[in-house]
């Protein structure tokens, strides 16, 4: 993924900047997302797939799972934190603590399938 790829740390800063510029930040609450457990992730993805992904993370450098999906040593921690954000948001909505939720997360994972990592 090059410097012009839309998936970058700057994406989250841009989202935050737009929320502030629109005056919406005063209506938001921010929560630290926990790391999802393998058991939690395995409720949406086959456990074998999750374990294969965890094993595919390189100790150094970058490994491409497909042309659009690169992983580095910190990728799984980021993915588990993203999943944890969604789980926490769901728990907070279901408990009635908040009415709705939006998770600005990295990596987004919006192309992923249940048993296949994609973009």
Segments (PLM) and residue ranges:
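HDAC/HDAC-like amidohydrolase catalytic core signature
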Residues: 1-119
């Amino acid at each position: 993924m090059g410097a012009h790829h839309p998936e970058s740390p700057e994406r989250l800063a841009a989202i935050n900047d737009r929320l502030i510029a629109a005056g919406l930040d005063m209506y938001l609450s921010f929560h630290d997302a926990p790391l999802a457990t393998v058991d939690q992730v395995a409720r949406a993805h086959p456990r074998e797939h999750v374990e294969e992904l965890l094993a595919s993370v390189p100790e150094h450098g970058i490994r491409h799972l497909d042309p659009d999906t690169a992983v580095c040593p910190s990728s799984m921690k980021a993915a588990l934190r993203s999943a944890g954000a969604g789980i926490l948001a769901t728990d907070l909505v279901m408990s009635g603590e908040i009415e709705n939720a939006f998770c600005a997360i990295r990596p987004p994972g919006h192309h992923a399938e249940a048993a296949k990592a994609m973009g």
